[in-house]
């Protein structure tokens, strides 16, 4: 694209300081937490702030406060299990399931329990009553501790939080939605799920096409700010369709249509949906998604209380940005702004390999991040032509290096 035809709208990103969070009462009204959900919220707070990557928890899926065991994982404690660790966890889980099956069998036949069995049964009955013994062996789940990962996510969020808040504020949505990446990705730009979801906001390719730019040259899922706008569009659509934030947030995991079916059966009674909705794919992940969001929001609102050893938040960095009005080659942008292409690519992670090879342009409407001061430098060098209108200062969400 020739920059001599006035095809760029130039914007200097001026970012607001971190604002105060809403009061707890305001949050409670928007994001209610029933007494029945509190058990799950506290469980996820423990997963993220108490139990480490070296620990594995065996718990009841329906009653997560029933924690049977917390055991140490054989080293090394990496990001994912080794084959040996996976087998070790499986063995511990199956051994517990066998013990629970024996307890259920004895309870059915009125056979006395051993002291160890009585202690194990008591863990269940204190929370779920005697009826909880039935099927307990089928409700055992293993959960690895994620304290280190969540802690690092809190630190990384310093890079993006204010920008995300500004996006949701501009969209007229609750600002607390900016904490959703704690659940989805721990704020990791390069996060990829087994389902093909990508980026901080974890969009699949199909969903992303509806809410952001997806072309051979650009994948906005990998630009945290652009993806936040896509998330805002999605969540507004979900809220308008479903009528409550618990339903809309859960749809981020389960889909709008899936939650519409649940709402049509049970109305807006979200706790009842969690207890009684038996949709085929409405499993543990979907049932816990909103509780995880509530837990993440509580931790993020007062991180020092959960990480007393201290945190070192990433510094929010400012950048200039431009929005292109027609398809543009990235090499042309690098030349125009006298910024080495590798440097531009580092702060524009949404650019695809094809764009960097020059075989696919960036689409019209794409926003390009430039090193802070680039527009001022270009202006001072006298590079103001009819093709490059004067930069307009506006308020815009903050961005930073956006490195993985």
Feature roles, as predicted:
Residues 115, 132-159, 163-166, 170-171, ...:
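Extracytoplasmic and endomembrane cell-envelope/extracellular-matrix remodeling and assembly machinery
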Residues 21-171:
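An acidic, Gly/Ser/Thr/Pro-rich helix-cap/linker signature
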Residues 191-211:
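Short, surface-exposed glycine/acidic/tryptophan-bearing loops
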Residues 174-181, 198, 245-250:
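Alpha-helical scaffolds flanking conserved acidic
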Residues 1-10:
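Bacterial N-terminal signal peptides that target proteins for export
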Residues 9-18:
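Bacterial N-terminal signal peptides
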């Amino acid at each position: 694209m020739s920059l001599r035809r006035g095809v760029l709208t130039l914007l200097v990103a001026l970012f607001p300081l971190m604002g105060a969070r809403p009061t707890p009462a305001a949050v409670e009204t928007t994001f209610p937490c029933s007494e029945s959900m509190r058990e799950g919220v506290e469980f996820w707070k423990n997963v993220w702030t108490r139990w480490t990557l070296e620990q594995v928890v065996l718990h009841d899926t329906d009653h997560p406060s029933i924690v049977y065991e917390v055991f140490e994982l054989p080293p090394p404690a990496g990001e994912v299990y080794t084959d040996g660790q996976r087998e070790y966890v499986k063995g511990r889980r199956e051994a517990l399931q066998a013990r629970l099956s024996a307890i259920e069998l004895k309870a059915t036949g009125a056979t006395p329990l051993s002291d160890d069995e009585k202690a194990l049964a008591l863990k269940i009955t204190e929370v779920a009553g005697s009826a909880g013994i039935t099927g307990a062996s089928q409700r055992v789940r293993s959960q690895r501790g994620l304290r280190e990962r969540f802690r690092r996510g809190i630190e990384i969020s310093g890079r993006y939080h204010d920008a995300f808040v500004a996006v949701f504020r501009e969209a007229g949505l609750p600002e607390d939605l900016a904490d959703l990446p704690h659940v989805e990705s721990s704020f990791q730009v390069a996060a990829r799920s087994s389902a093909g979801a990508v980026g901080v906001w974890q969009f699949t390719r199909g969903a992303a096409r509806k809410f952001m730019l997806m072309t051979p040259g650009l994948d906005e899922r990998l630009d945290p700010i652009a993806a936040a706008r896509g998330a805002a569009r999605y969540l507004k659509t979900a809220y308008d369709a479903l009528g409550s934030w618990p339903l809309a947030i859960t749809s981020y995991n389960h889909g709008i249509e899936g939650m519409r079916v649940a709402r049509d059966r049970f109305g807006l009674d979200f706790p009842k949906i969690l207890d009684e909705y038996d949709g085929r794919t409405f499993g543990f992940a979907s049932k816990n998604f909103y509780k995880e969001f509530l837990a993440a929001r509580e931790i993020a609102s007062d991180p020092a209380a959960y990480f007393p050893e201290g945190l070192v938040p990433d510094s929010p960095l400012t950048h200039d940005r431009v929005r292109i009005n027609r398809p543009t080659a990235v090499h042309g942008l690098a030349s125009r702004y006298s910024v080495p292409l590798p440097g531009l690519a580092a702060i524009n992670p949404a650019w695809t390999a094809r764009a960097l090879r020059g075989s696919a342009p960036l689409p019209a409407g794409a926003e390009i991040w430039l090193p802070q001061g680039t527009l001022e430098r270009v202006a001072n060098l006298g590079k103001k032509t009819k093709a490059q209108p004067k930069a307009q200062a506006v308020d815009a969400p903050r961005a930073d290096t956006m490195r993985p």
